[in-house]
Amino acid sequence: QIPWFHR
């Protein structure tokens, strides 16, 4: 998953 896309 994307860490800098986690709200």
Curated annotation (Swiss-Prot):
Record-level GO cellular component terms: extracellular region
Location in or out of the cell: Secreted
Subcellular location, principal: secreted
Modified residues (Arginine amide): 7
The keyword Secreted is annotated on this UniProt entry: yes
GO annotation terms (biological process): defense response; neuropeptide signaling pathway
Residues with the Pyrrolidone carboxylic acid modification: 1
The keyword Transferase belongs to this UniProt entry's keyword annotation: no
Keywords recorded for this protein, A-Z: Amidation, Amphibian defense peptide, Neuropeptide, Pyrrolidone carboxylic acid, Secreted
Family recorded in the similarity comment: Belongs to the frog skin active peptide (FSAP) family. Tryptophillin subfamily.
Name under which the protein is recorded: Tryptophyllin-5.1
Species annotation: Litoria rubella (Desert tree frog)
